[in-house]
């Protein structure tokens, strides 16, 4: 394992070094950029930002909605080129299985300061549920249920392990798996009734504005404290498509940026593409950083092309 880790790190370093040089025009085989969306609002926002830029450069982004395990398998098999949603340490198990073995490349860090753990409404927190260890003390009020996201999501796997090991006395609790939106619908239903509910929460996400929530302590063993989000690519992507490789090495987001786009979608009934385009029109200086050393598909100035498209 140590040997493969070193090889993977060396290869990734080589590709990043390649991405750090002036990009050259990509071959037509790179024109379609295959990306993945696990059905999360934040990744829908970042995919939209990347897509607006790629389209302005003359590329064709293709985004498939897939479960996280399928995304990793797709990256390994070359069916997915890029995934912007490698949340760490939440996806440590997938990292160990795919990235550490060299089958998938952890290409660049695109977001800092994330939080991902169990959350409760503020009135539940004020009632004394402030830590994972407090949950079972109020088991009857919660109905012994924890609301998670889609089946196969790394956070769900962590919660399932907690239940299996009877950590925090949660051995007889049930994990309710559903889509992100279905989970939040259930949370909002409980909030309206001031009922007890515990669910997966994370930043960035509009839920932090729409729901008065608090994050529980005590789950750091499984969820870490603050985290990061990384861009993954299929093995060899930056070598075969160095121009888009350079773009994806430049793509760094902020909490404010992502929250702004997600809020625009939620509050103004815009599509992610419309919200991303509006954000870039209002913040054109961001394009200068993202398109530094990047060309259009046919080798022209990408910054001028994307601005003209906007």
Question: Model-found features: residue ranges?
Answer:
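A conserved helix-loop-strand patch within extracytoplasmic ligand-binding domains
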Residues: 102-152
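Ligand-binding cleft/hinge of the Venus flytrap
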Residues: 50-57, 139-173, 281
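A bilobed periplasmic-binding-protein/Venus flytrap-type ligand-binding module shared by bacterial periplasmic
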Residues: 115-126, 227-240, 263-264
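Immediate post-signal peptide segment of exported/extracytoplasmic ligand-binding proteins
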Residues: 24-34, 55, 137-143, 288-290, ...
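Ligand-binding pocket segment of bilobal, Venus flytrap-like solute-binding proteins
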Residues: 80-84, 154-221
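C-terminal functional modules
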Residues: 255-310
